[in-house]
UniProtKB/Swiss-Prot annotation:
One of its GO terms (cellular component) is cytosol. One of its GO terms (molecular function) is thymidine kinase activity. This is Thymidine kinase. Disulfide bonds: none annotated. Pfam families: TK. Zn(2+) binds at C150, C153, C188, H191. Its EC number is 2.7.1.21.
Amino acid sequence: MAKKNAMTTTNGWIEAICGPMFAGKTDELIRKIKRYEYADVKSLVFSPATDTRSAQEIINSRDGRRIGSIKIKKAFEIYDYVLLHKPQLVGIDEVQFFDDSIVEVIQTLADNQINVIVAGLDRDFRGEPFGPIPKILGIAESVIRLTAICSECGAEASRSQRLIDNQPADYNCETILIGDTESYAPRCRHHHKVPNRPINDQTKNFKRALKNNFDKIVEQSSKD
């Protein structure tokens, strides 16, 4: 049985941990779950079968933390495990790989006094919202947004740069590509590149005008 003051808020809440690759999301998820386990809070941890980087029943963080997990293909499988094991806390890693049904599952758990902590990428390699994450952030009581360090300049990195033969991946590549340092690097906004990103003509004209204005300023400065 969980210790009396193990949960500091009313039972039935959602906490989301998000950010780019290499930001420590899984490490933070494991840390939080283990912290509650020290107070005898019963937990279950799930991860998508899509993610093949870890062993079948283990989640590994890049900092060496490990925790047991249940690999599932569909979000609704969580219900069966919860009914069987009756946890007070559910953790879900790599939540971006599930379809939108995960939002209903998370909401249902929280509505029924089960606390939920999820971790996942908030943006795909294009820098755009990833899968169900925007909806999850919208229903969460708490959001922890982590950053990594840009591999180009050392600034705060909020994006995951996909690399193919050490070159930025084209916008039209498949959204999901399971990989690690061989395929991805953390980047800040200004060093994140996505070739062939669709852009509106008005935006093109605006950017062209900005560049022309900047070039004129530089030219004038050189004359002065």
